[in-house]
Each structure stands twice: as C-alpha cells, then as structure tokens.
Regions:
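Nucleotidyltransferase catalytic core that binds NTPs
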Residues: 1-99
C-alpha cells in the first residue's frame, strides 16, 4: 500500500496550540505528516526567522514519531510533488477557510 502523507503548510509565526492540535490529529490519520514552514509574502513583519520557526516546530512535535518539519520557499504544489505527496492531503486550519 502507498504511504499516506499529509502536509501541514504555514508560516507558523509562531506555532500555536491550535496548529499543534491539527498536526496531532493528522498524525493519527496519516503515515507521515510534514509540518512545512513556508514563506508568506503577505506577512512582511515576521516575529521569528524561518530557522527559528523550524526549530520551534521541531521542539513541539518531537514527541510525535511520524511528524517531520521542513522549510520551503516555493509553491506548495511543487514541494508536494517533490515529496511524492501529490495525491495525498493538505491540512488547513479553520482560519484558512473562506468565511
């Protein structure tokens, strides 16, 4: 059977308890969850650098064995294809849904 991969993309500036809840839920449903720290070009004043956000995400997800954290500055679709996750899932939080 093909590995089921979920990507949880976001700027995670900072990562919150809400983000972590979504990540944990995804980890229960998928074989692998990638927390993808991305660049949000509409956010010009970030509180933390990309490296700091990656480190924070790694720390708070360290106890979840099927989660890994990565950084990507390109398009989500390109990253998903590179990871072999093109046909799998993307996790979105409620704030990302249209009102």
């Amino acid at each position: 059977m093909e590995k089921r991969i979920a990507i949880c993309p976001g700027s995670f500036d900072p990562i919150t308890k809400g983000h972590l809840d979504i990540i944990r839920r995804a980890a229960n449903l998928f074989d692998e969850v990638i927390v993808l720290i991305m660049v949000n070009y509409t956010k010009t004043n970030t509180a933390f650098t990309a490296a700091e956000r990656v480190e924070m995400a790694r720390r708070v997800t360290a106890d979840i064995p099927n989660v890994r954290v990565d950084y990507y500055a390109g398009l989500l679709a390109d990253y998903a294809r590179q990871q072999g996750a093109g046909g799998n899932a993307v996790c979105w939080g409620k704030t990302n849904l249209p009102h």
